């Protein structure tokens, strides 16, 4: 899946979409449809806050999201992930919101995360960013 799409989008194997498609092709449909897909910064934010919102940075750099426009539904349908389009990209967190870098996530640290980190419950958590651009 290392190719250039009709609208100039280039997908590389280290990006999330090829990995998600690989999983879809190897998992039972009833299991795949229950998955939530996160890039690492968003997963860490989820673990800290319990919120499934995603960062614009992760979605743009790793998940073929276009800021201001969202995802290209035709692209997802063409590659076999049409269910993402029909579910408003719920498995990618879009139905919960897309945040810019540093924007507050949820109500801050959950009690569990706060206890594990030795911090106060509700300590603000900002939307993350990826660690490199490739």
Protein language model annotation of sequence segments:
Residues 1-134:
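Glycine-rich phosphate-binding/catalytic subdomain of phosphoryl-transfer
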């Amino acid at each position: 899946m290392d190719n250039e799409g009709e609208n100039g989008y280039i997908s590389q194997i280290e990006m999330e979409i090829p990995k998600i498609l690989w999983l879809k092709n190897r998992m039972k449909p009833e299991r795949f449809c229950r998955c939530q897909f996160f890039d690492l910064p968003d997963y860490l934010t989820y673990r800290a806050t319990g919120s499934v919102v995603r960062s614009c940075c992760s979605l743009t750099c790793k998940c073929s999201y276009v800021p201001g426009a969202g995802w290209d539904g035709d692209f997802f349908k063409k590659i076999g992930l049409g269910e993402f389009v029909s579910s408003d990209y719920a498995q990618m967190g879009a139905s919960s919101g897309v945040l810019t870098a540093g924007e507050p996530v949820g109500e801050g640290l959950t009690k569990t995360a706060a206890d594990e980190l030795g911090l106060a419950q509700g300590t603000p958590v900002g939307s993350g960013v990826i660690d490199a651009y490739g």
